[in-house]
């Protein structure tokens, strides 16, 4: 009995371990779980029968053989289970590249097979839609290239005005009114502006027309009777004129009588004047001493008009000449004292593209003080699109005048746009996306490269400055023409990746706004908050 106790203790433990091992294999198998469960139940029933047999007859040989087999299977199952758990702990976690499996797969695995097949059919339809979208993007690119050719003569004229090759006329310099910018076309009304004449007005107009016809000498038979009536009325008016002529002599006689009466009154006035003269004679003796002085004063007064009349004419002429001569003389004296030459009007529009680029959001902070004297030689910025059959892309061309900084007259920056669908990117059809950008090499003159700096050190012994060969990159606008290259294998560093993202944004801004509407960047209107709060659609403005 003492020997049977350890067997009775170990057997149920072995059976329990066997059941755990079978359960773990059933979970790992997936679809074969039902078959494994059935086999496990059969094994459990057999083991249960063997355990019951061994408990009833511990001395029989069959019970010993069954117990030994069950114990051996239990020990093997326990050892295999322990090794599996240890191996799972030792395996490291998968890398990030291995975890690129989309999370939607886990959801699809739970769906029935029939539903999965339908979902795959929808994926194939989406791929066809992406192909249509590539055709749409290519058509947009062709339209941009077509209308860029229409804008080319306008851009050429802008280039000529900026660089003083063409002087605009007065009509071109006039500010266009808002009516000329209106997008609504005015319809021409065919209806007459004037109201139709009334019945009485029609008769008056007909009479006026007939009178005009008479003056021209045309003969109208219908109007002859009316003309005769008018001629008959004319002699009736003549007697009135004669009566008026008869009245005229009567009025003349009355005027003569009035003149005679006035002539009678004149002697009375003369008598009064004589009486006044006698009064003056009575007063005159008191002022006899001053008679000579009065006569001298009279003679002087007579001579004064002649003396004053002659010099007044030149005095007036001098007053007229003073405002014409004095300011010019004063200005000339001031210029002679200061020694400054007369300022001449600048030619063209100086620093046009420098001002434009400084007002661009992402590009302005890149321009350093050392870049400004170089960008003053920038004469034009143009945009060219790729030809048909080539990958979709566009190139910016920066034209420079001859300058002492580099030998290039043309600097280019090319952007290539992704035009093929990517199965790993489910949102390919959301518009343009720049895939790659390429710059150009700048042929700098000696000591004029602003994109790099050289380090200098002062040794402690000699104290002389030694130039080391190590070159340090410097912040500059011209780094825009040397972007980091995208490797075919591997990844970019976070710093280079951020530079490319900002570079793509700058290329999109130049493509959409700067080339087409550079004048608004030059005047600074683009940075006005009024233009940021509203959006322009033709001649109408809508709030965001």
Curated annotation (Swiss-Prot):
Keywords: Cytoplasm, Nucleus. InterPro entries: NAP-like_sf, NAP_family. GO terms for biological process: nucleosome assembly. Its main location: nucleus. Residues 1-109, 168-345 are annotated as: Disordered. Expressed in brain. Gene3D superfamilies: 1.20.5.1500, Nucleosome assembly protein. Residues 168-192 have a biased composition (Acidic residues). Pfam families: NAP. This is Nucleosome assembly protein 1-like 3.
